[in-house]
């Protein structure tokens, strides 16, 4: 199998062209490849497939390091756009892709940055999915170590966002897995910990579903800003500082699509025997 190793702000991926290669991945194979000591090592594997819809350019699949398939990854989407361009699979500047849960437009800007139309945030609890009687801007979540207030939203994948006073001392290591596996999120959840610096700037750490805490989570940054805007804490354009670097997130409110802008880096190409 030929592959590329890439990262978006330190959130690292193996990207595979399944258009020119005939490949099948079992969860066990993905877990073996994800092993940082015995395999390649990655947070997620991204698969480039032919489009299911003639009006689109590609189909985009995402697998966690534990072998589970997920519906969305914002940092991965930027790497996906960089990969299909570098490999000559398209010469378009605006690339239309489908995912498990919807469609996305990946735009390569003149300065090389990649701007992703992430679509509209989804707030309806049943569609996140999240167990609640109705939408609220804040929900009370009880865990074995503390009770937290969180916002819940889907960016094509489920997120809960907790505001913290200090990102450095936030209890991500213990609280992250408790939120990820909370019974009110039947498909598990990505847990974001957000410190508001001012209305146009936040700091964020994300404990990702199936991957643990990562250097950066693009959809998590989108979710944090969406929740912050909805709660009246943030303006429509926000710089999000993650451990691996910064993203710009723009959202003008309900009924509008959300945009994420950031970089994507190609590290190396490789071949591995399956």
From Swiss-Prot:
Cellular component per GO? cytosol
Ubl conjugation keyword on record: no
Record-marked site positions (Could be important to modulate the pK values of the two catalytic cysteine residues): 159, 208
Principal subcellular localisation of the protein: cytoplasm
* NCBIfam families registered for this protein in UniProt: DapF
Q: How does it assemble?
A: Homodimer.
| Name the UniProt record assigns to this protein | Diaminopimelate epimerase
Organism of origin is: Pasteurella multocida (strain Pm70)
The gene behind this protein is dapF
């Amino acid at each position: 199998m030929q592959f590329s190793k890439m990262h978006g702000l330190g959130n690292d991926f193996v990207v595979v062209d399944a258009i020119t290669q005939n490949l099948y991945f079992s969860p066990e194979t993905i877990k073996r490849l994800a092993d940082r000591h015995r395999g390649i090592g990655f947070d997620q594997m991204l698969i480039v497939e032919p489009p299911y819809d003639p009006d689109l350019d590609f189909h985009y699949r995402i697998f966690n390091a534990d072998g589970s398939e997920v519906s969305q990854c914002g940092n991965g989407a930027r790497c996906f756009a960089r990969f299909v361009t570098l490999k000559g699979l398209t010469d378009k500047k605006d690339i239309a892709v489908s995912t498990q849960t919807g469609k996305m437009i990946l735009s390569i800007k003149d300065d090389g940055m990649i701007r992703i139309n992430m679509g509209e945030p989804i707030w309806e609890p049943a569609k996140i999915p999240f167990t609640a009687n109705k939408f609220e801007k804040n929900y009370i979540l009880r865990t074995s170590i503390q009770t937290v207030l969180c916002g819940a939203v889907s960016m094509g994948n489920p997120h809960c966002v907790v505001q913290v006073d200090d990102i450095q001392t936030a209890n991500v290591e213990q609280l992250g897995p408790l939120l990820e596996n909370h019974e009110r999120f039947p498909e598990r959840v990505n847990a974001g910990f957000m410190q508001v610096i001012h209305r146009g700037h936040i700091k964020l750490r994300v404990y990702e579903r199936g991957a643990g805490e990562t250097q950066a989570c693009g959809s998590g940054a989108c979710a944090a800003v969406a929740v912050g805007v909805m709660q009246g804490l943030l303006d429509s354009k926000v710089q999000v500082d993650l451990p691996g670097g910064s993203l710009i997130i723009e959202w003008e409110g309900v009924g509008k699509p959300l945009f994420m802008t950031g970089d994507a880096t190609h590290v190396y190409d490789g071949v591995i025997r399956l």
